[in-house]
Amino acid sequence: MAVQESAAQLSMTLKVQEYPTLKVPYETLNKRFRAAQKNIDRETSHVTMVVAELEKTLSGCPAVDSVVSLLDGVVEKLSVLKRKAVESIQAEDESAKLCKRRIEHLKEHSSDQPAAASVWKRKRMDRMMVEHLLRCGYYNTAVKLARQSGIEDLVNIEMFLTAKEVEESLERRETATCLAWCHDNKSRLRKMKGRQSEHDAKTGRKSRVASGSPKESEDLGMETIKGKPELSCLEFSLRIQEFIELIRQNKRLDAVRHARKHFSQAEGSQLDEVRQVMGMLAFPPDTHISPYKDLLDPARWRMLIQQFRYDNYRLHQLGNSSVFTLTLQAGLSAIKTPQCYKEDGSSRSPDCPVCSRSLNKLAQPLPMAHCANSRLVCKISGDVMNENNPPMMLPNGYVYGYNSLLSIRQDDKVVCPRTKEVFHFSQAEKVYIM
């Protein structure tokens, strides 16, 4: 029974930590399936149209040349349909094989062979490190590690490299690449926006006018006009930034045209923000009047990068922290005790990761370990003190395990490792824990 419970806990832990491993390729497969369906439907409608035109022509007394021309058109449309279908099916097949490969990899964790389980754990650690490096921006290092470990098809490198291109374009103060990304994912971005709107409605939270920060950007309005969806939050922020850049370049007429094209259907909090930025038309680019000075701050580009990163993670249902970070924090919290943070440092153990200098600061904001039953650990040996190794207290008040005192006894005397005081072994008294 205990073995079954342990296996169930391991399986649940695996599902929680490995959710992104399967979710990202599944979303890619879903996206390619929908794109293939649209492409095939569109090309099929084109074929249907030319066939209908051919049938209409044949119902009369057409000339041979016109029939040949129409037949050539039918052949051309059929060729395009075949090519699009083959390309779409190949793309779907690649995504399906990737999902299957990752499922097979995750199944390997339950192997009965210790060597196979050890290899799987090593690969899992490498996958966590690759994802963490990608999130931190160390793309070359991450790619090299994935290639060296043979896990290129087990990590989401392609997704992060696409995000890298978008972020680099925003750093160059260009919006075209990010807008193209928004267009490729417009349906899912609008669904995200709709879910956020429903959540705000249920919680009674009112959307605030975005001032440029990623947190505020996610609170933009979610209304629709006459059944037509608004721009996604990120796309709207990009259009606002384009307007601001036109004002910065003193191209006010172009800014007005831009506003008419992209902001004419704004409503809700988006309309409030449009009204705010339209006020920039009355001020010079070097104005010191708030809030226009803040809108002209180049730091808004960094905020756009953060907003894109946030939306990209939500789009693929990824957390804001890497699995490596979460796993490390969970492990540190599980072994963190008040002894790790004694000011004098006397109670720190050299074998405790939390007591080490590199991880002590990282674990500081984490909660302490939950321990229903206390355990006494000998300072000398690190062994648990129990009925087989009873705790013994020296006259100076320090407690050590009986076996440890035996190991350091010389001429029936023991030296306290902490105070260097010398006592007779018979002076050590047994401690009883109630």
Swiss-Prot record:
The record marks C352 as: Essential for ubiquitin ligase activity. Its main location: cytoplasm. Residues 190-222 are annotated as: Disordered. A zinc finger (RING-Gid-type) spans 352-419. One of its GO terms (molecular function) is actin binding. It catalyses: S-ubiquitinyl-[E2 ubiquitin-conjugating enzyme]-L-cysteine + [acceptor protein]-L-lysine = [E2 ubiquitin-conjugating enzyme]-L-cysteine + N(6)-ubiquitinyl-[acceptor protein]-L-lysine. Residues 159-254 form the CTLH domain. Pfam families: CTLH (PF10607). Autoubiquitinated as component of the CTLH E3 ubiquitin-protein ligase complex (in vitro). InterPro entries: CRA_dom, CTLH/CRA, CTLH_C, Fyv10_fam, LisH, ZF_RING_GID. SMART domains: CRA, CTLH, LisH. Residues 1-124 are annotated as: Extracellular and involved in cell to cell contact. GO terms for biological process: cell division; erythrocyte maturation; proteasome-mediated ubiquitin-dependent protein catabolic process. The modification Phosphothreonine is found at T28. It is found in: Cytoplasm; Nucleus, Nucleoplasm; Nucleus matrix; Cell membrane. Residues 121-153 form the LisH domain. GO terms for cellular component: cytoplasm; cytoskeleton; GID complex; nuclear matrix; nucleoplasm; nucleus; plasma membrane. Its EC number is 2.3.2.27. Core component of the CTLH E3 ubiquitin-protein ligase complex that selectively accepts ubiquitin from UBE2H and mediates ubiquitination and subsequent proteasomal degradation of the transcription factor HBP1. MAEA and RMND5A are both required for catalytic activity of the CTLH E3 ubiquitin-protein ligase complex. MAEA is required for normal cell proliferation. The CTLH E3 ubiquitin-protein ligase complex is not required for the degradation of enzymes involved in gluconeogenesis, such as FBP1. Identified in the CTLH complex that contains GID4, RANBP9 and/or RANBP10, MKLN1, MAEA, RMND5A (or alternatively its paralog RMND5B), GID8, ARMC8, WDR26 and YPEL5. Within this complex, MAEA, RMND5A (or alternatively its paralog RMND5B), GID8, WDR26, and RANBP9 and/or RANBP10 form the catalytic core, while GID4, MKLN1, ARMC8 and YPEL5 have ancillary roles. Interacts with F-actin. This is E3 ubiquitin-protein transferase MAEA. The lineage of its organism: Eukaryota, Metazoa, Chordata, Craniata, Vertebrata.
